């Protein structure tokens, strides 16, 4: 491992302590709690939407979240290890077959919906427990 990779790994370990980042990908609905500074006080603002892609790797990894706010599509890019992110929560998993969901930009209403992923193991264990 070269020197830059070692330094990045050290910084990544330092930034990741105390944070739990769920395993999510494109199509998943996530809630990102962002620290917003207004004057001299800081508050936490929730931003919920569909993850339409993840970029980069390691310490430079980021993800894009898209939501519809008052009829307008709003996209925001968050670095995963940003100190401005308070927490990331996975709301639901989506069933998609693409790594980047940029086609959602041109869609509205029902055509922009993403089907929820049904985990086969959870349904079979729930059915077995019911019997």
Curated annotation (Swiss-Prot):
Task of the protein: This protein is located at the 30S-50S ribosomal subunit interface and may play a role in the structure and function of the aminoacyl-tRNA binding site.
Protein name: Large ribosomal subunit protein bL19
PANTHER family the record matches: LARGE RIBOSOMAL SUBUNIT PROTEIN BL19M, RIBOSOMAL PROTEIN L19
Gene Ontology process terms (BP): translation
InterPro entries referenced in this protein's UniProt entry, alphabetically: Ribosomal_bL19, Ribosomal_bL19_CS, Ribosomal_bL19_sf, Translation_prot_SH3-like_sf
Superkingdom as given in the UniProt entry: Bacteria
A Gene Ontology cellular-component term: cytosolic large ribosomal subunit
Cross-referenced Pfam families: Ribosomal_L19 (PF01245)
Gene: rplS
GO molecular function: structural constituent of ribosome
Keywords in alphabetical order: Ribonucleoprotein, Ribosomal protein
Sequence similarity: Belongs to the bacterial ribosomal protein bL19 family.
